[in-house]
Design a protein with these regions (language model features):
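A polyampholytic, Gly/Pro-enriched intrinsically disordered region
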Residues: 8, 12, 61, 65, ...
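Conserved ATPase-coupling elements of RecA-like P-loop NTPase cores
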Residues: 19-27, 52-54, 78-81
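NTP-binding/hydrolysis catalytic cores, primarily Walker-type P-loop NTPases
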Residues: 86-148
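Short beta->alpha connector loops
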Residues: 17, 47-49, 74-76
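Switch II (G3) loop of P-loop NTPases
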Residues: 1-26, 33-35, 42-46
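Short, solvent-exposed amphipathic alpha-helical segments in soluble enzyme
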Residues: 27-29, 57-61, 83-88, 111
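Conserved beta-strand/loop subsegment of P-loop NTPase cores
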Residues: 37-44, 61-103
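P-loop NTPase motor core
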Residues: 45-60
Protein backbone atom coordinates (compact mmCIF):
# COMPACT_ATOMS: atom_id res chain seq x y z
CA UNK A 1 0.00 0.00 0.00
CA UNK A 2 2.98 2.33 0.42
CA UNK A 3 3.16 3.20 -3.31
CA UNK A 4 -0.47 4.27 -3.15
CA UNK A 5 -0.05 6.56 -0.13
CA UNK A 6 0.12 9.73 -2.24
CA UNK A 7 -2.95 8.88 -4.29
CA UNK A 8 -6.13 10.82 -3.58
CA UNK A 9 -8.46 7.88 -4.24
CA UNK A 10 -7.66 4.17 -4.28
CA UNK A 11 -10.43 1.70 -5.04
CA UNK A 12 -10.07 -1.79 -3.58
CA UNK A 13 -12.39 -4.40 -5.05
CA UNK A 14 -13.62 -7.09 -2.67
CA UNK A 15 -14.38 -9.35 -5.65
CA UNK A 16 -17.90 -10.12 -4.53
CA UNK A 17 -17.00 -11.28 -1.04
CA UNK A 18 -19.94 -11.14 1.37
CA UNK A 19 -19.62 -8.67 4.23
CA UNK A 20 -19.17 -11.45 6.79
CA UNK A 21 -16.42 -13.26 4.84
CA UNK A 22 -13.26 -13.88 6.94
CA UNK A 23 -10.99 -12.89 4.02
CA UNK A 24 -12.74 -9.54 3.70
CA UNK A 25 -12.54 -8.97 7.44
CA UNK A 26 -8.76 -9.63 7.31
CA UNK A 27 -8.40 -7.22 4.40
CA UNK A 28 -10.26 -4.48 6.26
CA UNK A 29 -8.32 -5.13 9.47
CA UNK A 30 -4.98 -4.93 7.62
CA UNK A 31 -5.99 -1.55 6.18
CA UNK A 32 -6.98 -0.33 9.65
CA UNK A 33 -3.77 -1.61 11.27
CA UNK A 34 -1.65 0.12 8.61
CA UNK A 35 -3.20 3.38 9.83
CA UNK A 36 -4.44 4.16 6.38
CA UNK A 37 -7.38 6.49 6.30
CA UNK A 38 -9.90 4.27 4.57
CA UNK A 39 -13.53 4.86 3.78
CA UNK A 40 -15.73 1.94 2.84
CA UNK A 41 -18.19 2.46 0.01
CA UNK A 42 -20.80 -0.04 -1.05
CA UNK A 43 -20.87 -0.50 -4.82
CA UNK A 44 -24.43 -0.91 -6.11
CA UNK A 45 -25.37 -1.66 -9.71
CA UNK A 46 -28.31 0.48 -10.80
CA UNK A 47 -29.48 -2.49 -12.87
CA UNK A 48 -29.99 -4.68 -9.78
CA UNK A 49 -33.36 -5.61 -8.34
CA UNK A 50 -34.44 -4.23 -4.99
CA UNK A 51 -33.88 -7.51 -3.11
CA UNK A 52 -30.31 -7.79 -4.44
CA UNK A 53 -29.55 -4.21 -3.40
CA UNK A 54 -31.00 -4.76 0.08
CA UNK A 55 -29.06 -8.01 0.53
CA UNK A 56 -25.81 -6.29 -0.43
CA UNK A 57 -26.48 -3.47 2.02
CA UNK A 58 -27.31 -5.82 4.90
CA UNK A 59 -24.25 -7.95 4.13
CA UNK A 60 -21.85 -4.99 4.23
CA UNK A 61 -23.41 -2.53 6.68
CA UNK A 62 -21.21 -3.89 9.50
CA UNK A 63 -18.13 -2.72 7.59
CA UNK A 64 -18.78 0.91 8.53
CA UNK A 65 -20.05 2.31 5.24
CA UNK A 66 -19.25 5.93 4.42
CA UNK A 67 -21.55 5.90 1.41
CA UNK A 68 -22.10 4.16 -1.88
CA UNK A 69 -21.00 4.12 -5.49
CA UNK A 70 -23.71 3.65 -8.10
CA UNK A 71 -22.62 1.80 -11.23
CA UNK A 72 -24.23 1.01 -14.59
CA UNK A 73 -26.32 4.18 -14.73
CA UNK A 74 -25.98 4.00 -18.51
CA UNK A 75 -27.60 0.53 -18.56
CA UNK A 76 -30.40 1.10 -16.03
CA UNK A 77 -34.04 1.28 -17.08
CA UNK A 78 -34.86 2.96 -13.75
CA UNK A 79 -32.94 4.53 -10.88
CA UNK A 80 -35.75 4.36 -8.34
CA UNK A 81 -34.68 1.19 -6.58
CA UNK A 82 -31.01 2.07 -6.17
CA UNK A 83 -31.72 5.69 -5.17
CA UNK A 84 -34.45 4.48 -2.81
CA UNK A 85 -31.97 2.26 -1.00
CA UNK A 86 -29.35 5.02 -0.79
CA UNK A 87 -31.90 7.49 0.58
CA UNK A 88 -33.59 4.99 2.89
CA UNK A 89 -30.31 3.86 4.45
CA UNK A 90 -28.84 7.38 4.46
CA UNK A 91 -25.90 6.36 2.26
CA UNK A 92 -24.37 9.37 0.54
CA UNK A 93 -23.71 8.72 -3.15
CA UNK A 94 -19.97 9.39 -3.47
CA UNK A 95 -19.46 8.38 -7.11
CA UNK A 96 -21.44 7.15 -10.10
CA UNK A 97 -20.38 5.37 -13.26
CA UNK A 98 -22.09 5.74 -16.60
CA UNK A 99 -19.89 3.54 -18.76
CA UNK A 100 -17.28 0.77 -18.65
CA UNK A 101 -14.13 2.93 -18.72
CA UNK A 102 -12.75 3.61 -15.27
CA UNK A 103 -11.62 6.27 -14.36
CA UNK A 104 -13.07 8.12 -17.40
CA UNK A 105 -16.68 7.12 -16.64
CA UNK A 106 -16.39 7.60 -12.87
CA UNK A 107 -17.95 10.88 -11.69
CA UNK A 108 -18.80 12.72 -8.51
CA UNK A 109 -22.58 13.04 -8.78
CA UNK A 110 -24.69 16.14 -8.43
CA UNK A 111 -28.04 15.54 -6.80
CA UNK A 112 -30.00 17.52 -9.40
CA UNK A 113 -28.40 15.48 -12.21
CA UNK A 114 -29.32 12.19 -10.53
CA UNK A 115 -32.91 13.31 -9.96
CA UNK A 116 -33.18 14.63 -13.51
CA UNK A 117 -31.86 11.35 -14.91
CA UNK A 118 -34.24 9.31 -12.74
CA UNK A 119 -37.24 11.42 -13.79
CA UNK A 120 -36.19 11.21 -17.44
CA UNK A 121 -36.01 7.42 -17.28
CA UNK A 122 -39.39 7.23 -15.57
CA UNK A 123 -41.01 9.53 -18.14
CA UNK A 124 -39.58 7.41 -20.96
CA UNK A 125 -41.30 4.32 -19.51
CA UNK A 126 -44.80 5.77 -19.38
CA UNK A 127 -46.89 5.13 -22.51
CA UNK A 128 -48.56 8.08 -24.18
CA UNK A 129 -52.29 8.68 -23.87
CA UNK A 130 -52.69 7.87 -27.59
CA UNK A 131 -50.92 4.52 -27.17
CA UNK A 132 -53.14 3.63 -24.21
CA UNK A 133 -56.29 4.65 -26.10
CA UNK A 134 -55.31 2.48 -29.07
CA UNK A 135 -54.52 -0.48 -26.83
CA UNK A 136 -57.81 -0.34 -24.96
CA UNK A 137 -59.80 0.39 -28.12
CA UNK A 138 -58.30 -2.72 -29.67
CA UNK A 139 -59.30 -4.81 -26.66
CA UNK A 140 -62.81 -3.36 -26.70
CA UNK A 141 -63.36 -4.05 -30.41
CA UNK A 142 -61.69 -7.49 -30.41
CA UNK A 143 -63.00 -9.60 -27.49
CA UNK A 144 -60.70 -12.51 -28.46
CA UNK A 145 -57.68 -10.47 -27.31
CA UNK A 146 -59.28 -9.97 -23.89
CA UNK A 147 -59.58 -13.71 -23.30
CA UNK A 148 -55.92 -14.22 -23.49
Amino acid sequence: MAPLAKKRVVLVDTAGLPGNDPALRLQLESLASARIKAKNYLVLAATSQSQVLKAAYHSYKRCGLSGCILTKLDEAASLGEVLGLAIGQQLPVAYVTDGPRIPDDLHVPRSHQLVSRAVGLQAAEEPSEDAMAQLFAGLYHNPAKRAG
